[in-house]
Structure formats: structure tokens, C-alpha cells
Amino acid sequence: TSEIANKNAHLLIRISDLHPATNEINLNFICPDWSLNRNPEFLYTLFVPDRASTTFPCFDQPDLKAQFKLQLKIPQAWKSVANRSVEKEEILDSIKTLNFKLTKPLPTYLFAFSAGKFDTISRTKNGKTCVLYHREKEEELHNNTDSIFSLLFHSIEWIEKYTGIPYPFEKYDLVAVPSFQYNGMEHPGATLYRASSLFLDAKPTQQQLLKRANLIAHETAHMWFGDMVTMPWFDEVWLKEVFANFIADKVVTPIFPEFNFDLQFLLAHYDIAYSVDRTSGANAIGQKLANMKDAGSLYGSIIYHKAPIVMRMLEQKTGESALQKGLQQYLSQNAYGNAGWQELIGILNTAQTDDLPRWSASWVQEAGRPHLKTTVDEKNMVIEQLDPFEKNRLWPQELDLAFSENGKITRQNIALNSIKEELKNVFSGGNPEWIYLNSKGKVYGFVELDSTSVHYFLNHFSSLTDDLLRASVLTDLTENLYENKLNTTEYL
């Protein structure tokens, strides 16, 4: 037994205390409260991204996974939940001692436990039992419990089928935390949710129902994408989020057939991503992170809104089946380990004729967005891609050209893989009423509209009966306003 010095948040172990071969170090310490989130009647841990080391000695690096064995001593009347189930329980003098099973390999930010005056409800389906820890009133439970478990089991089953990998952890328990800081946090076996995000009013709107379903699907997707396979370093925190968003959208689509999900996606992501990407201070999806202390600075609109757009582009480029197979290989090859975006691109690139690494470098490592414009010469058209920062960069993508001649709309898909694309004999007469490169709302960039198209859209906007086309046109008209290609008087 010896004293260990504590300096600059590091424990200094003397060389003289170490011996050749294997060493085992046991530490006795008192946990600070910084990340224990204590309340009078409950507490919960929240270690993301680098706070585990404020509670116990460890290296907060996602590529250093460990197996955790936890013992808790809590008041007898309290309940507790952690990553694994309890293997031994003892009660002495009104103190409950709980010993939890050894976890799968986890990064420190996913190690978790909660304890307090919780009630529990459980449901079992196909041999899998899930438990909901909550502090809600009976009326709130009556209106929501069945829906919560139905969404949870649907999410698990759908993702198991999509990935070809059974649920990768022992259990899935939910903890509904009053006034939780986030909507959810994907601790395997003890996933935290903001209580108000799960327990809706008696007459929720369809949007509220969709939001809850998407949240449960998102956190469930993390069990495979982020928990089982984790990014090597937090500079790729965007990766676990984009995977979870991508999968969640697929999970909820069959539940809400009345929704236009392409329209929902456009409205949810493009305006917010553009609000950053049109500025001189835009940042790339992939960013450098020198120190884990700065990991929180990486979160923002580009991670949560541009990255999903790029992920959707990747599926469009590879095809749904090829991407699914690539993700299955990505997960199976790196189970309970670490892998990043480049590993996925490497897997997908072996089956692609296109240069995916080049495509990825443009969209993930570069900040900003392309500027797209058209020029018409009688029956011919030229599409140019300009770099707003004048670096001569290229962002390859699929364009959804549409134009109207004599009231007839023609559509054409165009793969833009160069700075300039010349199209011959596109038009029959050379005088289209309007030309639009983004008719399906999937093109990313500043789509400059020619004056004829602007005039038509502003004067015939209500005649555009396709909801997606109308929303896309409005988005791009707004961007033309921001880029000084359209004056305020015209726009209003």
C-alpha cells in the first residue's frame, strides 16, 4: 500500500511500485459529485464525452475499451439499473448491496448506472424482456406505456434484420429521467431518456408521435452504431450520430405511412445546414480534435444536419443493398471494437466503380457548399459548379434536373462529376418557362436560379402541386435571397 500523487488530473504511479510482467493496481477513492447528477430521490451518471475520469480514475478515450464490474450500496427502498443485470443482492441494516455482472467491452463514456425511487414496468416479446424505470403518475403511464414498448421492440427487431446481427448486449432497459439534459443517451442496458420525450399528453400531435418514435429508434440504433462499434476518437462523434439518424429514419418510415419523409427530411436538415455552410466560418463534418476536453465543441448544425444529407447521398451513390451489405460487414468486422468512416468507405469502395474516397474527401473533409448555375444556349445547356471560396474544389453529386416547355415538365438525372457539364439537345425549343436542378429536394448547395425561373416560381408558386418540389423551390429561392441573387421586394 502506498500513496499515489494526484497532479493535473493525473494519478502518478511510481516506477518502483511496478514490477516486470503483469501489474494490478487497486485504488481506494471517494467519487466526486460532478458527473453523478444527484437529486434528493435519485441519481444518474452521464459521462459523455470525457467525464468518467471525474468520477473514477480512467483514460477517457473511446478507443480504450474496458469491461466494468460494478458494486453499488444504496438505500433499501431504492432501485438501481446499470449496463448489466444484478448477479448478487444483499440487504444489511437497510442498505442494499448490488453486484452487477461484468460488461462487454465499453468506452468509458458508455459506462452507466442510475439509482433512486423509481417504479418499474416490464414487457416481454420473443423472449426479450425490457424494463422501464420511471417516476410518472398512473395517468401518464396509461396513455404511453404500450406505445413506448411497442416502438422499442419494433426498433430492435427492425435493426436486427437490417444488420443481420442480434441485439448485441444482455438487456435493454430504459430510464425516464425528469428534466434530463438531452432527449436521450444510449448507455447499453441503461438508456436514459428525458421523461417528457417519452410520456406525451393525452392527445399528442402526429409530429410529437413521430418525434418520440424517432428518438427511441435513434437511441436503439446506437446499440450497434456507437456502442458495439465505436469511433476511435471523438473527432468522429458525428459518425455515431449520422448512423443513428440514418437507421432511425428507416425504422419509423413504415410506422407512419401518412408522412412524406422526403419532405420531412428536407425541412428538418437543409435550412439549418445552409445557415452554417453559406458563411465564411463554415466547418467541415470531419474536424480535428487535439484534446478530449474540447470534444463538446464539435457538436453543432453541421454534425446533426449536413452529415445526414451526406449519408443519404452515400446510399444514393452506392445503392441501398450495397450500403446495407457494407454496413453489415463494417459491424461484424469490428464488433466490440473501434472503426471510423474511412473503414466504411474502404469496404464500400471495393464494390464501387466510382472513386468513393475522393467523393468522401469532398463532402466530409471540406467546409462549405458548391454553387450551381445553368446557362442555356438554344437547345443546349451548361451546368457549372463554382467554389464560393475560389479553391477550385469539386463536390460530386446527383442532380435532379426538371424543366417546363409549353407546360410540359421533363425530368432528367445528371451525375455531376466535373466543374462543368455540357448537355446537348436538352430542350426542344430553347425557351423553357423554368429550369431547376433540384426537383427532388436532394441536391446540396447554392442552386442559383436564372431570372426567367425566378420570375415563374414567384408568380406561379401556388400552382406547384408537388409538395416536395414546392418546398425545395422555396428553400432555394430563400438561398438566392441570402446570396444577393434575388431582391427582397421580389421575394416578398
Regions found by a protein language model. Give the residues of each.
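A generic structural signal for beta-strand entry/edge sites
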Residues: 8-12, 22, 93-99, 378-383, ...
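Hydrophobic alpha-helical and helix-loop surface patches within well-folded domains
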Residues: 7, 100, 132-396, 406-408
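Short alpha-helical segments and helix-capping/turn motifs at coil-helix boundaries
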Residues: 10-12, 53-58, 66, 161, ...
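Extended, low-hydrophobicity, Ser/Thr/Pro/Gly-biased non-transmembrane segments
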Residues: 17-19, 24-126, 133, 146-147, ...
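Long, ordered, helix-rich scaffold segments
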Residues: 270, 301, 391-394, 406-412, ...
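Short, glycine- and charge-enriched coil/turn segments that flank and shape catalytic ligand pockets
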Residues: 19, 88-96, 126, 140, ...
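Solvent-exposed beta-strand/loop surfaces of large extracellular or lumenal domains
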Residues: 1-17, 36-43, 83-93, 398, ...
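Preference for bulky hydrophobic residues occupying beta-strand positions
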Residues: 13, 27-29, 72, 132, ...
